[in-house]
Each structure stands twice: as structure tokens, then as C-alpha cells.
């Protein structure tokens, strides 16, 4: 049970992180030359009020750094890195529900690039199942700012912070790191 709770917690955190990361995935076939690729995305996420075995609404806030970013020659410039933040609203989230995986969660995120330009995203995070339960695949669209109208993809893996047990000690925090590059198509 402890492993299931940890997996769920990690999955939830990943989902949140994924929102923060904004788009960390593989490049679709139709996007031969991405507009921006960030090879490293990592950070932290907090859950309020925290995940337990009892379903309840949670707000996940994630913050992180995107580095090793390169753009398409002649395309918009970012300065090579950015700071991202995300807000994910989880309706009736619980350790049990997330441990099962195969969850679809929506959220918003924003990147402030090194050159001070910004990109705002609408995201959908889809969690895996089984051994991929702590991995979230991200898809979405840039809704404002630099790269507006373009799609984003990504993938992140998260790890629960501390020693939550989902009964007396809720999942309140996690770290995340991309497993595939953050890409704006």
C-alpha cells in the first residue's frame, strides 16, 4: 500500500510539475523543426490542501527552470533559458485515484524567458499507468506571448518529497524533472 501511495503521490506531483514544465515531450512527425527545444526542465511542486485517501479538490503550484534551450534558426529568441510556473486544479484528487493512473488533468503555465519575454500555456496532462504512473505526458497550446498559437509537448517524471502516507500525513510536495525535451512546435 505504501508503494501505491508513493506512486500516486509521485504521479500527482508529476502532473503538477508537468503543468509547470509546460511541455516536455517528443516532437511530432509534422513538426520537423521545432521553434524551441529545452533539454532540461526541473523544479518543485506544492499541493494544497494536500493529497490523502479522501477525495478532495487540490491546487498544485509548480515552479522550475528550463535550461539548455535552443531555437529554430531565424525564429523567435528566448535567451536560452526560462523560469516557469504552473497552476493545476485537481478536482476530487486522492492518493487512490492517482495511484491508479490514467488521469487527465488540466492547468495553465507561464514561462518568463531569459530575455524577459513570456509564453503562457493551456495544458492537458495525462498520467501513465503501472511503472509509468509517476510520468505525465503534456500537450497544449501557447495562448499568449512569444510563440502564441503554437502547440507544446513534453513529459515529466515526479518524485514525492518527504514521507507522506496519505492517511495521517498528506502529500504536500514533490520534485519533477523532464524525461523528454520541452518542445514548442
Give, region by region, the residue ranges found by the protein language model.
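A charged, solvent-exposed segment within the mature domains of Sec-exported extracytoplasmic proteins
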Residues: 128-185
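Predominantly extracellular/secreted and cell-surface proteins with exposed
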Residues: 53-143
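Secretory targeting and sorting signals
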Residues: 1-31
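Glycine-centered structural positions embedded in regular secondary structure
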Residues: 41-43, 107, 154
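Classical cleavable N-terminal Sec signal peptides
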Residues: 4-12, 106, 116-119, 123, ...
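Solvent-exposed, flexible loop/coil residues
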Residues: 5, 51, 55, 151
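Small disulfide-bonded, cysteine-rich extracellular recognition modules and tandem repeats
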Residues: 4, 20-21, 41, 72, ...
Amino acid at each position: 500500500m505504501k508503494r501505491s501511495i508513493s506512486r500516486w503521490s509521485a504521479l500527482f506531483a508529476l502532473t503538477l510539475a508537468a503543468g509547470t514544465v509546460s511541455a516536455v515531450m517528443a516532437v511530432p512527425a509534422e513538426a520537423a523543426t521545432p521553434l524551441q527545444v529545452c533539454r532540461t526542465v526541473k523544479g518543485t511542486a506544492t499541493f494544497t490542501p494536500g493529497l490523502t485517501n479522501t477525495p478532495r479538490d487540490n491546487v498544485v503550484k509548480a515552479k522550475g527552470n528550463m535550461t539548455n534551450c535552443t531555437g529554430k534558426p531565424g525564429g523567435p529568441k528566448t535567451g536560452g533559458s526560462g523560469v516557469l510556473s504552473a497552476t493545476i486544479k485537481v478536482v476530487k484528487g486522492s492518493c487512490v485515484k492517482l495511484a491508479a493512473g490514467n488521469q487527465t488533468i488540466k492547468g495553465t503555465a507561464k514561462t518568463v524567458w531569459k530575455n524577459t519575454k513570456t509564453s503562457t500555456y493551456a495544458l492537458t496532462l495525462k498520467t501513465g499507468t503501472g511503472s509509468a504512473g509517476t510520468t505525465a505526458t503534456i500537450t497544449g497550446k501557447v495562448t499568449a506571448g512569444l510563440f502564441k498559437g503554437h502547440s507544446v509537448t513534453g513529459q515529466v517524471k515526479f518524485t514525492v518529497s518527504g514521507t507522506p502516507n496519505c492517511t495521517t500525513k498528506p502529500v504536500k510536495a514533490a520534485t519533477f524533472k523532464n524525461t523528454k525535451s520541452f518542445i514548442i512546435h
